[in-house]
Amino acid sequence: REIFEYGNKRKAEIGAENVFDFSIGNPSVPAPKSVNDAIIDLVNNFDSVALHGYTSAQGDAHVRQSVSDYINGRFGTKLTANHIYMTCGAASSLTIVLNAIMLPGEECIAFTPYFPEYGVFIERTGAKLVAVQSENKTFQIDMEKFEAAINEKTKAVIINSPNNPSGVVYTKETIEKMCDLLRKKEKEYGHSIFVITD
């Protein structure tokens, strides 16, 4: 957040058009008209009590069902709405999942560059962030460095694609190699290594 505040200061000093904010993923372009229209439609035509009220802890049942239907259609899985847990933003999702799976002394890998708050989320569990440098020119995962970073304490890997802040999208080949390597390491160490997608 310090970088975000520094960016705001520089915008005031030299103009917003001269500062490129890669800190916390705030948009730099207006929302598409279709998004604005959908919001206006909700405000004008949806039950205002329901719109501004709380949902169940897991999130709105209809939204969770829509998400599970989409995932099932795309990937051939058999998820139900009960497999889906909705949150307001990645920070709460990451905090929940990391607190659920990480134990003190374990390690979680992230690929550089990464969202700086990953370190805070991981370290609050008593675990350690292990930063693995990405390939210099492409920002894809450097598989040799990745393999060297995995050990018996590795419990999770956070991937972010499109990446914040680089914007890189991991290729299918990169993801497949990563998964193959993790399956190999799970067998070697005898425990699961979770992939967390942000």
Spans of features found by a protein language model:
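Active-site phosphate-binding strand-loop segment of PLP-dependent enzymes
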Residues: 135-198
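N-terminal small-domain helix-loop-helix segment of the aminotransferase-like
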Residues: 1-89, 96
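A short helix-loop-beta submotif of the ANL/AMP-binding
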Residues: 123-130
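Proline-centered loop/turn at the N-terminus of a beta-strand
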Residues: 18, 107, 128, 155, ...
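Short acidic capping loops at alpha-helix termini that bridge into adjacent secondary structure
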Residues: 78-84, 105-107, 153, 191-192
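Short beta->alpha connector loops at strand-helix junctions that form conserved
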Residues: 112, 131-136
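Conserved PLP-anchoring active-site segment centered on the Schiff-base-forming lysine
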Residues: 100-121
